């Protein structure tokens, strides 16, 4: 009986540890230029799972990352200008974010965590950002098209 209890405790501990080890870190760079043009988050679309983190890394100055749309129950974020930020995404859904100084250039991105439970509100946020952008109008829409319903 004592040996069985030890095995049970060990199995539970291993399951918990492996669950934490499976969480991934995704890196998004904030750049003046990249594969998708000027003033970009790279990559602009990230597919993640609940518990994953996204690390926004400042490559060039004068950028930040601010959430615009997050799923119900999720916490938004806002980094200061010239600072990166790491965000843990625990809630399933679509997260839309932007760079405040370069929103007019449609410097924005999309993260899908698990199921797209807030697809419609995320689409509305993308449409609003795109309508307000002076340039790169297809960029954010292209990222959002990668969201799987």
Regions found by a protein language model. Give the residues of each.
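Bacterial N-terminal signal peptides that target proteins for export
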Residues: 1-9
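Cleavable N-terminal signal peptides
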Residues: 10-11, 21-22
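Extracytoplasmic copper-binding redox domains, predominantly the cupredoxin/blue-copper superfamily
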Residues: 23-149
């Amino acid at each position: 009986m004592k040996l069985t209890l030890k095995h049970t405790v060990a199995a539970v501990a291993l399951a918990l540890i492996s669950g934490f080890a499976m969480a991934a870190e995704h890196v998004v760079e904030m750049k003046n230029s990249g594969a998708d043009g000027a003033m970009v988050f790279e990559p602009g679309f990230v597919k993640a799972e609940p518990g994953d983190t996204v690390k926004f890394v400042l490559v060039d100055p004068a950028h930040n990352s601010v959430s615009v749309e997050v799923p119900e129950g999720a916490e938004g974020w806002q980094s200061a200008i010239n600072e990166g930020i790491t965000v843990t995404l625990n809630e399933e859904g679509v997260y839309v974010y932007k760079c405040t100084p370069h929103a007019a250039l449609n410097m924005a991105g999309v993260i899908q965590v698990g199921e797209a439970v807030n697809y419609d509100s995320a689409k509305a946020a993308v449409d609003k950002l795109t309508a307000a952008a002076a340039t790169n109008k297809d960029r954010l829409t292209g990222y959002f098209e990668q969201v799987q319903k």
